[in-house]
């Protein structure tokens, strides 16, 4: 089922006007009864047909013995029946021409395994062009169209708003809908196993709803990866951020996902590549997700960075300290200890605090997250100084707590002054917002004053959610002002907000240079068997990744001839195809400055490791990096760049992208490496050509596109990076049966 037919079926399901409930029940607490209750709560008032051969009537309503008794096809068949009855009922619905179905049950088949029944249900629905939510789901609430097709009692009414939710987890679905966050929903789907209709379909539908400003995903696996990738790019092009919580990135997590849903979980490289390619925001837990959704859902964005940093207003001095790392925030503190500053790089945050210790806490956490505070200008400093009591420093993050007099004026004025600074991308009132026993409303009113005085993002950042005054938080949220619940989760949300920018270029739109015959030439050679070391370097050179002069040798005489060709000093390496890590077996000898040294080294290596060698010119010194191509079972070939050398596995410092890559995307991957400062020659080290490294990443991405169907994995380690460019010193290529990229 593809194209308009698929989209039409999804729309018929999520906007259903006629619904059949198979398994309707009058028994209180039963699934069939709860489903009826929820459908009756639907503001759209759909026509609902009850089906259950056990009953003639349920309450005042007629109950039919069979789905076949309904005269006309319906938009949605809700199957509130046991797994044993699912196939029969879905076949009946498909034969009648019903448009869609929800399968709430898990669709397990005793004695047959998990795949059999689910595969047959999938085939039935696809053959009939039906949309299908589930199996193993809680259903959906189409808030924008007033439809509640869920079998569990959820908040009524569910507040309308900017968030479209799709989750593989039913428990997370219920928890998010019940969270007292005033998030507001346009659509909420518990999609379960996604036998037919998948996350990509729901995203595409949600993008067509006027109210959707952000999409929230909880994903156990990638289903229909190509369709999901396209949907995520459409979301980015529409300026609708996608926030995803992914699970199953560890071996234990993958096993649990498989046990839970039978799904192959994407590992961390899969998710990282997806985020790198589409701009999808990845969060680590539900706390980070809800803070991020609330902040982005408020609808305000940090302006384009004319200068670095954002500034926070703190009510304590200790929460304020930070230096530069990229775009940042601003905070106001009410105590001096919370304030230690870090310098600006791009937009930053600003924060205002009323406690010194909590300001320091915020600063420490922000620093650990690479979230910078804005470097505010002299005009802002002067405005702040005029508001503060004597002895308080006018800096960002800001501790405003002196005598406590005129708290509303000082807090609101500080927040507003920081928001007006060009270097500030977002402002946080970083206070605990506890219940004020004396009825004081200074914090509430100051936050609202600041929100109304600027168009920049303003939020309240509470450090201890359990102490948060829920009534005060509700008032602020009703005014549109986000209240972030937790130091780390709130600061991460601010970092995500500041990361929003121009959408990445979809891989399909990246134009690779045309090299007629290149792919055919290498496919033919690779089909003949493994490459020699010099051939592997030639392959890389064909894709713009140079290497030193190199020649293969199968005897001492050939080695000496090769050395004469490349010039002394030379490097001698074993070229046995079964040895992956040459240095581990003593298979590399460097600094051979003449024929005698080379002959002796050759004889020694040949005696231990066999006669096949490669003789290479000695490369100039540089920083050792690594490049790679891996074939992901879900996304196809992926490109990896990271720290190289003998510590590559230990350091595990790498970034992953989906080919083909633009130069901008490749530079971004390099910039995000922890080892990136080393390339600038720290402590007198060698300064590497970062542009050449990024160009090598781009070249490898073109190789991955052209040859990713025959190469299972490719490692370039080390890739020597110096001031004159890069040189690939070794390459390991694993071949496999030809495969096209998964769709």
Spans of features found by a protein language model:
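Catalytic-core regions of core metabolic enzymes
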Residues: 1-316, 321, 328-330, 336-743
């Amino acid at each position: 089922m593809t194209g308009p037919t698929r989209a039409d079926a999804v729309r018929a399901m999520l906007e259903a006007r006629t619904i059949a409930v198979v398994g309707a029940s009058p028994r209180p607490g039963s699934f069939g009864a709860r489903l009826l209750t929820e459908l009756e709560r639907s503001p759209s008032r759909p026509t609902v047909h009850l089906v259950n051969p056990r009953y003639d009537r349920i309450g005042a309503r007629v109950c039919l013995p069979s789905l076949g008794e309904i005269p006309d096809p319906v938009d949605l068949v809700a199957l509130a029946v046991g797994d044993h009855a699912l196939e029969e009922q879905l076949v009946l619905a498909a034969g009648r021409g019903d448009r869609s179905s929800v399968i709430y049950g898990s669709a397990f088949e005793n004695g047959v395994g998990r795949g059999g029944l689910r595969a047959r249900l999938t085939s039935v629905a696809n053959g009939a062009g039906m949309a299908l939510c589930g199996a193993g789901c809680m259903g959906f609430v189409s808030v924008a169209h007033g439809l509640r097709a869920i079998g569990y009692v959820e908040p009524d009414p569910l507040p309308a708003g900017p968030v479209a939710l799709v989750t593989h987890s039913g428990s997370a679905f219920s928890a998010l809908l019940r969270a007292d966050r005033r998030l507001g929903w346009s659509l909420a789907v518990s999609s379960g196993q996604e036998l037919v209709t998948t996350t990509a379909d729901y995203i595409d539908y949600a993008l067509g709803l006027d109210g959707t400003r952000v999409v929230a995903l909880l994903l156990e696996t990638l289903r229909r990866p190509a369709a999901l990738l396209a949907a995520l790019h459409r979301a980015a092009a529409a300026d609708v951020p996608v926030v995803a919580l992914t699970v199953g990135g560890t071996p234990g997590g993958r096993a649990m996902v498989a046990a839970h849903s039978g799904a192959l979980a994407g590992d961390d490289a899969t998710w990282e590549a997806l985020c790198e390619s589409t701009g999808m925001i990845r969060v680590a837990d539900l706390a980070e997700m809800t803070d991020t959704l609330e902040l982005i859902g408020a609808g305000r964005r940090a302006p384009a960075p004319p200068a670095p940093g954002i500034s926070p207003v703190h009510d304590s001095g200790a929460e304020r300290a930070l230096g530069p790392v990229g775009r940042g925030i601003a905070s106001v503190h009410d105590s001096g200890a919370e304030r230690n500053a870090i310098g600006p790089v791009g937009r930053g945050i600003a924060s205002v605090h009323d406690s010194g210790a909590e300001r320091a806490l915020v600063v420490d956490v922000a620093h650990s997250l690479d979230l910078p505070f804005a470097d505010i200008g002299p005009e802002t400093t002067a405005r702040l100084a005029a508001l503060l009591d004597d002895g308080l420093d006018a800096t960002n993050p800001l501790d405003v707590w002196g005598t406590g007099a005129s708290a509303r004026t000082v807090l609101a004025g500080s927040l507003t002054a920081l928001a007006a600074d060009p270097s500030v991308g977002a402002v946080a009132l970083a206070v605990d917002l506890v219940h004020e026993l004396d009825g004081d409303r200074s914090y509430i009113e100051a936050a609202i004053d600041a929100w109304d005085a600027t168009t920049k993002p303003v939020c309240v950042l509470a450090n201890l959610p359990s102490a948060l005054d829920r009534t005060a938080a509700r008032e602020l949220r009703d005014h549109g002002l986000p209240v972030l619940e937790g130091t780390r989760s709130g600061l991460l949300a601010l970092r995500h907000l500041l990361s929003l920018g121009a959408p990445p270029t979809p891989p399909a739109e990246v134009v690779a240079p045309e090299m007629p015959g290149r792919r055919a030439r290498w496919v033919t050679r690779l089909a003949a068997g493994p490459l020699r070391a010099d051939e592997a370097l030639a392959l890389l050179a064909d894709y713009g990744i140079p290497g030193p002069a190199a020649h293969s040798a199968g005897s001492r005489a050939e080695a000496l001839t090769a050395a004469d060709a490349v010039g002394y000093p030379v490097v001698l390496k074993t070229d046995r195809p079964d040895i992956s890590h040459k240095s581990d077996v003593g298979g590399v000898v460097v600094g051979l400055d003449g024929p005698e040294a080379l002959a002796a080294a050759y004889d020694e290596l040949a005696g231990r490791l066999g006669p096949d060698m490669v003789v290479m010119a000695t490369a100039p010194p540089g920083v050792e990096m690594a490049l790679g191509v891996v074939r992901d079972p879900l996304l196809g070939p992926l490109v990896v760049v990271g720290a190289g050398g003998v510590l590559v596995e230990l350091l595990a410092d790498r970034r992953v992208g989906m080919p083909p890559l633009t130069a901008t995307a490749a530079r971004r991957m390099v910039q995000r490496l922890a080892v990136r400062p080393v390339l600038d020659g720290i402590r007198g080290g060698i300064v590497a050509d970062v542009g050449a490294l990024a160009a090598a990443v781009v070249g490898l991405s073109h190789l991955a596109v052209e040859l990713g169907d025959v190469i299972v994995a490719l490692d370039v380690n080390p890739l020597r990076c110096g001031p004159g460019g890069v040189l690939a010193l070794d390459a390991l290529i694993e071949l496999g049966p030809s495969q096209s990229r998964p769709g």
